[in-house]
């Protein structure tokens, strides 16, 4: 199997391995210090020990800037390790375009999946397609920044990308329903649960309790997509020294065959012109002299329909941050649309109900 990975040992002391191509995507969750990042390093080490850059390409996302940056410079990477959450949606968009491109190639050659296509390439001496694996070390950061785009791209890739050799590994330390939505979970039948704080968190990950009784430090429950119940495993430990040795070994090689349209510039994975990387521009990042917030008219509609206005209400209704909601409310007060806040409740009355919105 091309994407075989060692998970650790079960309670009987037998080694446990899994195949990412059969999963075909993996969801990992657990509290801080439970062993998520160690497990990811374990999986990546297995890939790097068994596959060349011609066979496998990686996209690594590490918002914490600690766990995966040690892999920078290895020829398997399509771009340097992504540490800015703003670029991740663009990376997922690039993956979707690559998926569509591969499906077109399959259609032209009358093949069904990447294995059939690569076998055909062996006969015709054409260039094979590498497997593409996206590893996200913290999903919560993306879901807070751009929940709609993140969920949409992850779901589409999870549903369609399997046959094209594109696989996802997502990890989070916040196993809550707003991060691991029903749509995401439905497309990730293979899951790993490390130690969590409560049975509620365990149910979010595995759909039943048990992970709250794990010991931590690599103690995990692995739910295979074809297994009726999860298996308890102690994950393998790959030290930083071993990771550095592995990365240093691969840095000594040059890449002879690049993945199609390799995006290896600093502005990697940019979406099409005019398409923002984030769900909406952060108002606090805009210049003061620019026009009104793009959502100002929408905010006026909301406060008029509610009959009152408050910062917390705009946060809930519009799914925006406190700073942006506060600026919108201040601008409404400046234009005479809402009153000053009530000293006790901080709720504002609507002063203008029938005047035109901001032009």
Regions found by a protein language model. Give the residues of each.
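P-loop NTPase motor-domain active sites and their immediate coupling elements
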Residues: 1-11, 15-17, 22-23, 54-57, ...
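P-loop NTPase switch/communication element
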Residues: 18-24, 48-86, 90-91, 183-184
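The Walker A (P-loop) glycine that initiates the GxxxxGKT/S ATP-binding motif of P-loop NTPases
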Residues: 29-30, 316
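The conserved Walker
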Residues: 31-33, 172
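Conserved lysine of the Walker
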Residues: 36
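Hydrophobic positions on the alpha1 helix immediately C-terminal to the Walker A/P-loop
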Residues: 39, 43
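Short, well-ordered alpha-helices that flank and scaffold nucleotide-derived cofactor binding pockets
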Residues: 45, 49, 159
């Amino acid at each position: 199997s091309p994407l075989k990975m060692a998970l650790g040992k079960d309670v009987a002391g037998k080694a446990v391995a899994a195949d990412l191509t059969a999963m075909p995507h993996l969801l990992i969750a657990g509290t801080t210090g439970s062993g998520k990042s160690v497990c990811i390093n374990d999986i990546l080490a297995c890939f790097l020990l068994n596959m060349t850059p011609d066979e496998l390409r990686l996209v690594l996302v590490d918002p914490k800037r600690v766990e995966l940056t040690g892999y920078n410079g290895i020829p398997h990477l399509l771009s340097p390790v992504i540490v800015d959450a703003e670029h991740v949606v663009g990376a997922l968009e690039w993956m979707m375009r690559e998926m569509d491109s591969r499906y077109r190639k399959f259609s032209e050659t009358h093949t069904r999946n990447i294995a059939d296509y690569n076998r055909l390439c062996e006969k015709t001496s054409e260039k094979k397609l590498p497997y593409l694996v996206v590893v996200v070390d913290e999903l919560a950061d993306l879901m807070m920044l751009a929940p709609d785009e993140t969920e949409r791209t992850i779901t589409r890739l999870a549903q369609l990308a399997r046959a094209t050799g594109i696989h996802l590994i997502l990890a989070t330390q916040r196993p809550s329903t707003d991060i691991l939505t029903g749509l995401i979970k439905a497309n990730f039948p293979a899951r790993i649960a490390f130690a969590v704080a409560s049975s509620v968190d365990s149910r979010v990950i595995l759909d039943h309790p048990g992970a709250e009784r794990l010991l931590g430090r690599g103690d995990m429950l692995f739910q295979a997509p074809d297994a009726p119940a999860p298996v308890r495993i102690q994950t393998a430990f790959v030290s930083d020294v071993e990771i550095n040795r592995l990365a240093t070994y691969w840095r000594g090689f040059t890449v002879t065959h690049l993945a199609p349209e390799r995006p290896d510039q600093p502005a990697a994975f940019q979406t099409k012109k005019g398409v923002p990387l984030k769900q909406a521009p952060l108002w606090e990042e805009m210049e003061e002299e620019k026009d009104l917030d793009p959502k100002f008219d929408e905010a006026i509609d909301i406060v008029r329909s509610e009959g009152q206005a408050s910062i917390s209400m705009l946060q809930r209704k519009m799914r925006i941050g406190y700073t942006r909601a506060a600026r919108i409310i201040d601008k409404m007060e400046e234009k005479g649309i809402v009153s000053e806040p009530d000293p006790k409740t901080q709720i504002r009355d609507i002063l203008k109900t029938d005047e035109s919105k901001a032009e």
